[in-house]
Design a protein with these regions (language model features):
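PLP-dependent class I/II
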Residues: 1-253
Length: 253
């Protein structure tokens, strides 16, 4: 479906149309939805938009049809205030039985060790029988597909949560990167507006998307108003690999 409409808002009409189109041909659909801090746009739905998305799902889940809504929250820990970024999740706790919400979580990103590729998958449902079935199916399919996540990542997460002081240290370190990304986000927005550069709506995370348009294609150069020194907030040697990558992208013209 088309993600944004002509007003640069989430395109609910296209979202609904494509779900209904698929469900006229078959009885079930799996929807993959990456938010908040969507990759690659950095878009986060507003509270009202989440309500509208849920309303569309319920409207489309007519009798005899099943919807699995896979919510990829990989970048939720870099989507602004941690508590506010999670406030939308309870909205999915009141779905009918024919709508199953599955949440994919990335410990690798949330705990700043990308290379270990550690994550988890859980479901949100009011029905204990559906939850039990999900656990059985997920356990069987994961063992048959990739067996398990990296042991080193699992061990690291377990160690962090056994030690309150270490956990607090991790949160503080991650907060530094959150603040770093937030400042870069604001700087890029200001520079883009100054240069007349159109972007897809974004407000958090690692990414921004510049759509191909007549307006943007006429731009021959985009020069951020901030200097390299203002972006250089710490030595590259002391920054995690993903932060170094973002720094390089931020300074590229």
């Amino acid at each position: 479906y088309q993600m944004f409409d002509e007003k640069n808002d989430f395109n609910l009409a296209s979202f609904r149309e494509h779900i209904q189109s698929v469900l006229t041909e078959q009885d079930s659909i799996v929807i993959l939805f990456n938010a908040p801090a969507h990759n690659p746009t950095g878009y986060t739905p507003s509270d009202e938009t989440w309500d509208e998305i849920i309303r569309v799902l319920k409207e489309c889940a007519v009798s005899g049809k099943k919807i699995t809504f896979f919510l990829d929250i990989a970048y939720i820990d870099f989507a602004g205030d941690s508590d506010k970024a999670r406030q939308f999740l309870p909205k999915f706790g009141h779905m009918p039985d024919n709508i199953l919400t599955v949440v994919g979580f990335s410990a690798s990103k949330g705990f700043t060790f990308y290379g270990l590729r550690t994550g988890a998958m859980l479901c949100i449902t009011q029905n204990p029988e559906i939850a039990a079935e999900f656990k059985r199916v997920a356990s069987f399919s994961s063992r048959a597909s990739w067996s398990n996540t990296a042991r080193a990542g699992q061990a690291a997460i377990a160690k962090v949560f056994r030690d309150p002081q270490l956990l607090q240290k991790v949160f503080e370190e991650r907060k530094e990167y959150e603040d770093l990304l937030s400042r870069r986000c604001r700087a890029f927005k200001e520079a883009a507006e100054e240069a007349g550069l159109t972007t897809c709506p974004f407000n958090a995370g690692f990414f921004v998307t510049i759509p191909l348009s007549t307006k943007n294609s006429k731009k021959t150069e985009f020069s951020p108003s901030l200097s390299a020194e203002e972006f250089e907030l710490r030595s590259p040697l002391s920054v995690k690999p993903h932060a170094v990558w973002f720094r390089r992208k931020s300074l590229r013209r």
